[in-house]
């Protein structure tokens, strides 16, 4: 970038005086002071302990920890949407620093993940080279913006010194279990001791077994089943076009990959999973203690989705079919059951005459993703299994069907259908001529509004009645809820009867699913896990961390036919044979172990980065306890502690923000941090919006190359449509800060941003 001199500079319409404020003069002034700030360490915040300590500078000063959601270092660099929040936090931090506060404000880079890997595959350049180059460019852009950051604290999630501690935290979670009585995580060794001493008894399928009668391997499997991180065969989103498994959040509403737009299929695979559901109540209840926007709290509440009701058991020839319902008072109106096509009892339930139809339907359902299956606008389909189950309150034998709108991953994978009180069940019953029994009498006004008589058969009603009316047809010889009573009263009566007669029990369920934590790709944190000859997982010792990511030249995953759901993933690390096998002494002598070949998801590094800013050079701990308490400890009794101000986008409401809270709560339970929550105050800065343009295929085209003439828009001579929305690389409509610096200067850009 050029600089001004004392002689007039040529410009539009003639000469420009040397000290007229323009972009060149702005650059000279701004860079002078940016250099001054660096040379004088103007924005460095002292710690209370460790290499960044300065107790004299800390004494008598109130602390303030300000945090921006750190950027992903893409090849395009920053666009003008990124600084919207950065500038606001910078102004706030500068003001508070001027009032005497000790302000910690820094920024790092969320640099692992699929986008970098996909870019590397396209360009043939190793993702590490790309990532480091992109980070250098972003550092330049941020410095030029004049942000008051403590550069000593900047981190990148791909640094070995950083992901060493990501792996260490993973092992803390892996080596923990959730004690339901104490409502907290505890070390897995404590569970082992409780079983060994007899203090804790076995339950479930081992309820009548003595712990000491089990082999060491059997005991180990039971212990592993309690871990907060565990291996499980579970329905996953398999994307053969990317060669990897995706989290639900990485699949679009159309059932395709968010990156690449490939088809996604539901498959059962063995995957690492984090038991975030153990923390569902705390994640939900502690929202009330946070200074967050109500809209974000509501999104998390809905995502966690706590429901109270009952688990009810229906007897069948294949065994008991358990359902969860929020309305056990409607059991008297249950006239059929619907199971997920993947339900484990389907094979045993299906009659010989219906087997071919059931298998054909299941094959079709396998080709659909969860979003497609639960689309309210899609016609509901199903197949009769030919079996029946017994309604526990009526004693009636009711048909058992399968339907793709019932998901195995939610609830029990089975529902009790009450067509008179549920629109979906009503439509299904109408379509397949299944019985409908009214259990609540609507008001006269309801009948009048639908122009039908109160005496009309409910099967002829135009729709289900979903309101509250007078209970009818709801009694047996032991229980009756007929008449006018509240729903809560009726639920209590039915729940009591179910428990007394061993047909069910009151229960709470959640929409929140456990977190799928494996990725079949290269550019991510390796798992600090090895497997023995029995295929049992073991922790890599702390002193051997980090498990370094091998430098591969061929880092492409085995991408497959995007439409072939029968294929299996082959992670790139599985090809590194000299890395795959390792000899370790884990306490019983040197043995050969096999490394885990999956890597962690991109969310891993961002689950704890706020903690590393506090103590970025500490090689002994992920953060010094005194330093964490100073910057993030609770301010008073009942205060959660955490970052004082966190600024970022609303798009992270149920992903990064929820995952970070989960990790932080585990660290709190284990005594590694003093704060119960990572982010006490949250602010969403909104978006910078811009026009985007799409061609006839619906693909975005570069906005800067679109030509406007007489109100019409073309790209390379072809007509395109214009839409208005968020600025982003994928929409090809970004404007970079560099363009603003060159034309107006950074300070002018900051003012108008």
Where are these regions (language model features)?
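Conserved oxyanion/phosphate-binding beta-strand-loop segments in alpha/beta enzyme cores
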Residues: 2-6, 14-67, 97-106, 130-136, ...
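Residue patterns forming the tRNA-binding/recognition surfaces of aminoacyl-tRNA synthetases
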Residues: 2-11, 15-26, 31-32, 36-40, ...
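N-terminal cofactor/phosphate-binding cores enriched in small/glycine residues
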Residues: 33, 42-46, 64-130, 136-143
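Short, solvent-exposed turn/loop segments enriched in Gly/Ser/Thr/Pro and often Arg
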Residues: 50, 69-70, 104-115, 154-162, ...
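Conserved active-site neighborhood of enzyme catalytic/cofactor-binding cores
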Residues: 73-107, 257, 387-389, 410-446, ...
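Catalytic alpha/beta core of large soluble enzyme barrels
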Residues: 89-90, 102, 343-442, 459, ...
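Switch/connector loops and helix/strand junctions flanking conserved nucleotide-binding motifs
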Residues: 113-118, 446-449, 691
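Nucleotide/phosphate-binding sheet-loop regions of phosphoryl- and nucleotidyl-transfer enzymes
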Residues: 264-266, 273-276, 332-360, 471
């Amino acid at each position: 970038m050029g600089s001004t001199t004392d002689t007039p500079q040529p410009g539009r319409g003639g000469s420009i005086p040397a000290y007229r404020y323009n972009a060149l003069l702005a650059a000279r002034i701004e860079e002078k002071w940016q250099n001054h700030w660096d040379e004088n360490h103007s924005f460095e915040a002292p710690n209370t302990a460790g290499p960044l300590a300065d107790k004299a500078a800390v004494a008598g000063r109130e602390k303030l920890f300000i945090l921006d959601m750190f950027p992903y270092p893409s090849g395009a660099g920053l666009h003008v949407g990124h600084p919207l929040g950065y500038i606001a936090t910078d102004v706030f931090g500068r003001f508070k620093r001027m009032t005497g506060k000790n302000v910690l404000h820094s920024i790092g880079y969320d640099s692992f993940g699929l986008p970098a890997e996909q870019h590397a595959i396209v360009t043939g350049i190793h993702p590490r080279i790309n990532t480091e180059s992109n980070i250098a460019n972003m550092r330049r852009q941020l410095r030029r913006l004049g942000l008051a950051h403590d550069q000593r604290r900047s981190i990148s999630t791909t640094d070995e010194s950083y992901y060493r501690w990501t792996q260490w935290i993973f092992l803390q979670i892996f080596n923990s279990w959730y004690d339901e009585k104490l409502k907290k995580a505890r070390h897995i060794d404590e569970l082992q001791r409780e079983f060994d001493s007899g203090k804790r008894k076995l339950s479930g399928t081992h309820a009548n077994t003595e712990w000491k009668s089990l082999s060491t391997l059997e005991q180990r499997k039971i212990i592993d089943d309690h871990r907060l991180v565990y291996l499980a065969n579970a329905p996953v989103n398999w994307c053969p076009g990317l060669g990897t498994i995706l989290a639900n959040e990485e699949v679009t509403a159309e059932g395709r990959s968010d990156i690449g737009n490939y088809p996604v299929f539901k498959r059962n695979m063995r995957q690492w999973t984090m038991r975030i559901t153990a923390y569902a109540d705390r994640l939900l209840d502690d929202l009330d203690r946070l200074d967050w926007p109500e809209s974000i709290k509501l999104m998390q509440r809905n995502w966690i989705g706590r429901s109270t009701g009952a688990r009810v058991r229906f007897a069948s020839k294949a065994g008991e079919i358990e359902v969860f319902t929020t309305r056990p008072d409607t059991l008297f109106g249950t006239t059929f059951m619907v199971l997920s096509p993947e339900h484990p009892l389907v094979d045993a339930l299906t009659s010989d005459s219906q087997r071919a139809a059931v298998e054909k339907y299941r094959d079709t359902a396998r080709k659909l993703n969860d979003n497609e299956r639960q689309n309210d606008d899609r016609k509901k389909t199903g197949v009769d299994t030919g079996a029946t189950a017994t309604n526990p309150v009526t004693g009636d034998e009711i048909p058992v069907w399968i339907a793709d709108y019932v998901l195995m991953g939610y609830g029990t994978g089975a529902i009790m259908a009450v067509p008179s009180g549920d629109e979906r069940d009503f439509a299904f019953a109408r379509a397949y001529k299944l019985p409908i029994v009214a259990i609540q009498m609507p008001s006269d006004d309801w009948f009048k509004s639908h122009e039908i008589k109160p005496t009309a058969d409910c099967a002829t009603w135009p729709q289900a009645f979903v309101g509250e009316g007078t209970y009818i047809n709801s009694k047996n010889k032991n229980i009756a809820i007929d008449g006018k009573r509240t729903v809560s009263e009726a639920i209590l009566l039915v729940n009591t009867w179910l428990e007394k007669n061993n047909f069910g029990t009151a229960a709470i369920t959640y929409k929140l699913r456990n977190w799928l934590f494996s990725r079949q790709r290269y550019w991510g944190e390796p798992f600090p896990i090895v497997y023995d000859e029995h295929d049992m997982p073991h922790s890599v010792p702390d002193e051997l961390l980090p498990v370094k990511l091998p430098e591969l030249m061929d880092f492409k995953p085995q991408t497959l036919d995007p439409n072939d759901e029968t294929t299996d993933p082959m992670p790139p690390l599985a090809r590194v044979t000299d890395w795959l096998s390792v000899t370790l002494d884990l306490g019983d002598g040197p043995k050969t172990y096999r490394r885990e070949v999956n890597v962690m998801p991109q969310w891993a590094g961002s689950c704890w980065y706020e903690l590393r800013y506090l103590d970025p050079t500490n090689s002994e701990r992920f953060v010094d306890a005194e330093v964490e308490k100073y910057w993030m400890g609770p301010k008073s009794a009942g205060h959660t502690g955490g970052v004082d101000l966190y600024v970022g986008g609303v798009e992270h409401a149920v992903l990064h923000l929820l995952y970070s809270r989960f990790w932080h709560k585990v660290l709190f339970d284990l005594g590694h941090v003093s704060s119960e929550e990572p982010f006490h105050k949250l602010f969403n800065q909104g978006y910078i919006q811009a026009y985007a343009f799409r061609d006839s295929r619906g693909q975005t085209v570069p906005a800067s190359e679109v030509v406007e003439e007489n109100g019409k828009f073309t790209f390379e001579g072809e007509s395109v449509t214009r839409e208005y929305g968020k600025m982003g690389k994928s929409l090809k409509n970004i404007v970079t800060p560099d363009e603003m610096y060159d034309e107006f200067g950074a300070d002018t850009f900051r003012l108008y941003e």
